[in-house]
Amino acid sequence: MTTTPIRFGRDIPDDAELRLCGDLNHAKRALELGVSRHRNALAMAQAGARAIAVDPDLAKLDDLRARAVELELPVQGHHGDLADLGFATSGSIDLVVADHSLVTVDDLGRLLRQVHRVMKSSRPFVISVPHPFAGVYTTDQYGSKVHPYGTVGRTVGDWFIHLARANFRVDQILELGVSETSPVPTTLVLRAVKEGD
């Protein structure tokens, strides 16, 4: 079976190129926070990890489970709020990936504290979100309208502050998606590592 790499968004490089997640094997546990369109929990399981996914949308979990059965991959699914990680013991997760699933989270601090609790120290937490600068300029039927930076989604600085307050250290920031059709980045990818215990 061909191993599918973990993906962080549409039309941007995947983890085979970016190498943000590290090696996964049978001894490692990996968590997908919010089932993404790429169903990264399947890629985690294909790589040999004990894959877990949590999502408040039961339909997404059912779709993930059906695909896992079809591919004969062991994937554990949990229905609930993204911050409800009580199923995982403290310090038990080696990798957490959130592919465009944290955009609408209201209490980001609570979620980050829970992710910090379940992760092993010095392990990666990879977050991808729409790049905050991509929402600055839009066009409507009356002409151009400019949205000030920070009025559409969290800014890069907001992400750094929230992650630092939850005791994560950002060690990589990637601004991806610049192309002939998009002069500004479309996707912001952050890799943070857990500090402390």
Language-model-derived ranges and their functions:
Residues 2-28:
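Conserved alpha-helix/loop element of class I SAM-dependent methyltransferases that forms part
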Residues 29-84:
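Class I SAM-dependent methyltransferase SAM/SAH-binding core
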Residues 83, 87-96:
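A short acidic, Gly/Pro-enriched loop at the edge of an enzyme's catalytic core
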Residues 94-109:
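A short SAM/SAH-binding and catalytic strip from SAM-dependent methyltransferases
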Residues 109-124:
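A short glycine-rich, Lys/Arg-flanked "PGG" loop and its adjoining helix->strand segment in the class I
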Residues 124-151:
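Conserved class I S-adenosyl-L-methionine
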Residues 152-173:
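Short alpha-helix
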Residues 166-168, 182-197:
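Core SAM-dependent methyltransferase catalytic element
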